[in-house]
Amino acid sequence: RDKDIVRCLRCFTCMAERAATSTRRCTVNPLIGRELEGDEIQPAPVKKKVLVAGGGPGGLYAAWTAARRGHQVILCEKEEELGGILKSEIAIPFKKEMYQLTETYARFARQSGVEIRLGCEVTPEYVEKEAPDALIIAVGSRPLVPPIPGIKGENVIIVNELYKNQDRVADKVAVMGGGLAGCECAIHLGMEGKEVHLIEMRDELAVDANVRHRPLLLKEIEKYVHVHAGCRVEEVTADGVRCRDKDGNELMVGAQTVICALGQRGRTDVVEA
């Protein structure tokens, strides 16, 4: 039974929504705050063939929901592993619930009869071949990697790929990007005893964190991370990151490893194809 429990992510969405909108919401339980609206899942009047493109949390949940409604569901994931962006959370111990959510949704989908095809990319030709009655596109996003000189150097790791490259992270690290992902990555590396420098071009950090989570996050940043706010990255070198602050002064942040956490961009090109 333990494996059938959708566990709390400790994401603070429930408390943040209460403060912001006077409602209750939950990242993993869509019934929270909607208890009077009736059952979430209703049997479909007609069974259809549904093709889901993408094996991240969104695709898995959509496939599971469609299967519970009685549809024939095929889920395709182009990688050899399910999880989407949540695969990267396995690198950070205090984010393990995020990674476990993928495992839970995958188990539910399989138990509901969803056919999962790994290493299978959905293309227009593939859709034509399968001829589904409905196509759900849940291909997620890709890391935003601006054309900064040196950003493709051997000492640079994209934050989404950290879980596969932890042995490459040296003792002195610069994290580019002070959003939620960059901040959490920096805290984790700081907890491991590394010297971590966080570079953010805005004056504030983690502006994408919710109102309850952010204050706690900033306290951990103070404990473990050297912050360089208001600094724009101009170049990545073998010695670290060259930046410029808002007054025009040049700053060199020394680092052996550079983590790129400059955001995500929706894969709209896949949708439009």
Regions found by a protein language model. Name each.
Residues 1, 108-119, 125:
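Repeat-solenoid scaffold signature
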Residues 238-241:
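Short, hydrophobic/aromatic-rich segments at coil-to-beta transitions
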Residues 44-77, 82, 117-131, 138-155, ...:
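Rossmann-like dinucleotide/flavin-binding elements
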Residues 1-52, 57, 62-68, 169:
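Flavin-dependent oxidoreductase catalytic cores
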Residues 72-112, 188-231:
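Rossmann-like dinucleotide-binding cores of NAD(P)H-dependent redox enzymes
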